[in-house]
Amino acid sequence: MKFVDSASVRIEAGKGGAGCLGFRRERYISDGGPDGGDGGDGGHVYFQGQDGLNTLSEFCFKRLFRAKNGQPGSGQNKRGKSAQHLTVEIPLGTKVYDLVTDELIGEMTKHEQTILVAKGGFHGLGNTRFKSSINRAPRETTPGFPGEVREIGLELSVMADIGLLGIPNAGKSSLIRQISSARPKIADYPFTTLHPSLSVVSFCDKHIVMADIPGLIENASKGAGLGFKFLKHLSRAKVLLHVVDILPVDGSDPVKNFLTIEKELKKYDQELANKEKLLVINKIDLLPEKDRNTMVQSLLKDICYKGKVFNISALNGLGCKDLVAGLFKLVLRK
């Protein structure tokens, strides 16, 4: 399914049903009074959050959502049936905007949370409502009121506990395959990850959600590569996991690669750049065992990093169990 993280739709609530103009007509009653009933109310339109959804692609094909109208009233003071409300499901992490006023209507953060987007029209009044001591046979009624019509914008930011960072081919997809049941595409060329993806990591009957985005490259803030436009999907993450390939196949410098990511993060959003991070040094198995500690310490010194570090091999699983345990300990503490 195509990943879509923004959409615009037209929402039309239902119109209220018209009031009835009616008079009592029965045998032996020549001049019955008014008995026109009220109409029914128009249907509201709600958005509802669903945790099984992770894209707005549905709204590429359907852009109009219209609730039904209320039924008109009828004789014998019978009120028209009110219309059922329309509920439209959207992914968690979606912000709902009014495109005309730029008002933020609401934000989906919980499963089955509902947001009222457009109110249905109020019902029309039957002529019985207008009977009075001086007007015993009113012919006045009111039509149903129109429902609200709104142009709505949807902006999705995926909800995850952990956000993955790294240059293309740093090993993020391999890491996801190693510690979760997800099976992202892996290849020896950049940008095998083309859009944000979510995976669930389990440990001791607990679960956390990890988000991966396309790798970042230098000048991403100017539009280079694929990852920059997806950085917003890491904004909700509790912790960022920066994956560094210590022995890149393209011969690039891992120190420069790390600093490039940090620089592009700051250009995008200082608040995101200041999120708590863990450093994962990948492909540690390719280093001679006797030199591993020295090379890792040299890297940490060059990037001036003093936080928590995990040395792993995403290919064969070396160090991944310790990484998962550390992630759960950190996330569950927040």
Swiss-Prot record:
Pfam families, per the entry: GTP1_OBG, MMR_HSR1
Matches recorded under PANTHER family: DEVELOPMENTALLY REGULATED GTP-BINDING PROTEIN-RELATED (PTHR11702), MITOCHONDRIAL RIBOSOME-ASSOCIATED GTPASE 2 (PTHR11702:SF31)
Residue span(s) of domain OBG-type G: 160-332
PROSITE patterns xref list: G_OBG, GTP1_OBG, OBG
Highest taxon in the source lineage: Bacteria
Subunit structure: Monomer.
Residues covered by the Obg domain: 1-159
Entry protein name: GTPase Obg
Gene3D superfamilies attached to this UniProt entry: GTP1/OBG domain, P-loop containing nucleotide triphosphate hydrolases
Keywords: Cytoplasm, GTP-binding, Hydrolase, Magnesium, Metal-binding, Nucleotide-binding
InterPro entries in UniProt: G_OBG, GTP-bd, GTP-bd_Obg/CgtA, GTP1-OBG_CS, GTP1_OBG_dom, GTP1_OBG_dom_sf, OBG_GTPase, P-loop_NTPase
GO cellular component terms, A-Z: cytoplasm
Species this chain originates from: Vesicomyosocius okutanii subsp. Calyptogena okutanii (strain HA)
HAMAP family given in the database record: GTPase_Obg (MF_01454)
